Amino acid sequence: VIVFSVQNPPTAEAQIVNYKSESCGCCTMWQDHLIENAYTVEGVNVDRMDLKKDELGVPQNLRSCHTAVVEGYIVEGHVPAREIQRLLLEKPDAKGLAVPGMPINSPGMEVEGAPNDPYDVIVFYEDGRQEVYASYR
């Protein structure tokens, strides 16, 4: 007998707080991507994102335009919803995930007709370690 267990994705309960600049359009588009993937998102406009990133401990080399927090994890930049879901399912002993910069055609950075920028989703830890969590090519 083979038994399969289907676990509800954690997206239904996951509350995401997204810190962003008020004028950032791609930050709002990323929030829309998360909402389309069943997350509840609260956008919080911040005047000095650099100070918010410092407060949360986002490494300089991983920074992007917006910084979110979900279930104690930091999500920096245009991280795809599926990688957030994976993070919440696996619950690694990590500080968070990041997509450094603003890769074209990553979630929230869609540009019709433009080629996709390859990018990595990086998992980062309190001790400073950083590893590739997923790659998009």
Language model features: what each stretch is:
Residues P9-N37:
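Local sequence-structure signature of Cys/Sec-based thiol-disulfide redox active-site neighborhoods
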Residues Y19-S21, V44-V46, H78, P100-M102:
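Active-site-proximal beta-strand/loop segments in catalytic clefts of secreted hydrolases
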Residues S23, W30, N45-R48, P80-I84:
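Stable alpha-helical elements in mature extracytoplasmic
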Residues V1-F4:
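Hydrophobic membrane-insertion alpha-helices, especially the h-region
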Residues Q15-I16, Y39-V41, E71-I74:
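Short active-site oxyanion
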Residues E55-R137:
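Thiol/selenol-based redox catalytic cores and closely related redox-interacting motifs
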Residues Q31-L51:
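Conserved helix-turn-beta segment immediately C-terminal to the redox Cys motif
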